[in-house]
Amino acid sequence: MINQLLDFLNASPVNFLAVRNIADKLSDSGFRRLDPAMPLGTLKAGDSFFVTKNDSSVYAFRIGHKPIADAGFHIICAHSDSPTFRIKPNAEMLAEGSMVKLNTEVYGGPIMSTWFDRPLTIAGRVIVRGADAFSPETMLLHVQRPLLQISNLAIHFNRQVNDGVKLSRQKDVLPLLGQVTDELEKGNLLMNIILEELNKEREVKRDDILDFDLYLADATPACTFGVHNEFISSGRLDDLSMCYAGLEAMLSADLSDTTQVLAIFDNEETGSQTKQGAASPFLAFMLKRIGMAQSGSEEAFYQAVERAFMISADNAHAWHPNYPEKYDPTNHPMLGGGPVIKFNAAQKYASDAASAAVFASLCEKAGVPCQRFVNHSDVAGGSTLGNILASSIPLRGVDMGNAILAMHSCRETGSVRDHEYCVKAFTEFFNL
């Protein structure tokens, strides 16, 4: 099971590739890809289908034995994006006549220092000319070799570096791409790389490239480590590990009375306020359309919402042995201790006593341990998907996730055992 997760992480350096890989696995398992611009048609028990939005979010559905008005929805949601650096337009910056850097901007909230002095690569999507102005073609790109590096300043020029350094997002974190050896290469290095990669798939001319969404990614493969290989080291565990756990559960679960939903949103790391984010009404539209297809009435959707339950799956903070003072004294999850239910008195999480009891019961039924997380009262925490989604669809639900160390680092640390626990709990949820 863990090797499949590692393969998925290695093949999914950015949101676009993660969604494509999820879509491919859904298709291989018999789910039909539907165009959301077309009618759903008649739906019957066992029908399995999915739709995508913006190439970076994906929504999978399996219709249950009972109409949604009678049995509701069981929904697992997660997000496809992770903190990184986005490559700006006109990105090449020439220094001293030959050294080429790329101009980037920060996406989300990365621990920027963790991106230094490690091999990086480029991944994302390229938009090329299509049949007409409103129908450009999307091509995905993943340069599968080390291509760039952000280098530290030597300690001899910065004697205070180990006392903490404030980094400039515009100056200090620009990656080195290469050296130009020919006058014709100046201003063309990045585009030449893009063309080389795209032409592995099909012939693309430079004039056909209209734009791109390209990002930096760690070029070092995900791996396990520890005396018993009990830990996972990888970028993007937050939140691709939860995406993959939800996918594994969806593909292995039995058909049940309840309609099963897997929703992988984008842009959680920047607030979710996009057409492909959790704040979008897109999922609500799809659920309402399922109700209309079954009954011809919106009333089915409103009844289903009252019977539904949502698991918002986004990683939690594991207790760090070097910084115990940062954690709540009685509610600090441990690596390998099982899925973590998140609570916050300021309502940053959807969990309450009633919904937490439901999830804890699911874990118990699946034979999985369960933990609880509350922030240290003097340390501000983050927010996640649950309440954002619940503000547009008033779902009963819980915010949870597997515990990880170094959240938002270029490489995070998780637990092999926790991934196995999470898949069991999610599968139990879908089976009920």
Put a short name on every predicted segment:
Residues 1-432:
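N-terminal hydrophobic/helix-forming segments and targeting peptides
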